[in-house]
Amino acid sequence: MATGCSVAAAQTITLRYAQAASAHKSIYSLPIALAEREGLFRREGLDFRVVIPIPGGADLMIAALHDDTADLAHVATPFLVRAALAGSDAVAIAAEFNDPIYSLVARPEIARMADLKGKVVGMADPDGSIAYSMRKLLALHGMSEKDLRLRTIGGTPARLGCLKRGECAAVPLGQPQDLLAQSEGYRLLGASNDAVPAYLYTVTAARRSWAAANQDAVVRYVRALAASFATIRDPAKRGAVVNTIVEMTGVEPALAERVLELYAGKNVLPRRGEIDLKGFAQVIAFMGETGQLKDPLPAPQRFVDLRYLQDVGIQPK
């Protein structure tokens, strides 16, 4: 296996990575954005290019792998499962975000969950893990979606806009927008991880056939991604990580620091890109509970190819 130094001297490989516009400027692109900023892809001899398909909703990322728009794609696990069961040979080759924290944030006049009855609540894809966790959170407070007027809005930035314009009484927000909103007087009603078990949120996906034919490129990518996760945890690189969050999201450095403090000690980020099969199984269980999948539920191993992680010494969790 080539080392980082010898790889850099080898032939450069172009690698196209599809990402939805809603993810591109969000915290969920941190591992990729940091790897770009720190030259980790370049060190592995990769000409790494982020591609944002137009139109480019999160549900279209697997399609980008099939129409030759991209080689790899950032995708939430439910979308990957649905695509694979519909005939795609797309599989997860590495994890990007494990167990996300989505906050249900409301306008200042909403003092408690019950105050949302009859009001417009912006929600993510109804078949996705965010909406599932919000339904569970509502249930903890004796409520259901039937008590609300739901509006599907893709991406934390767009949902925050709905909240600030007064068109939504509450919305689920990721970081750092949830912390930003709270600093501006909006109210935290609850968080996703109060209501659901830990699960595997987003992964890097590739077509199984393409990855097998381009193993060297995939291994280089996985090695760079693992280095990015190590950089995130390196105290000496804290400034670079904070600056990356600031550049991605437009928040102040102090707020970016709060995001990292929130994630410290939690299972939000993989340590090296390892795939949490138990967390993936939990996603499949969510999908079964909501009627998207029928019994017997498929095993998570059906939707992953671990060989590229194993090639760089990373085992599944």
Which stretches of residues belong to each language-model region?
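C-terminal segment of classical bacterial N-terminal signal peptides
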Residues: 1-7
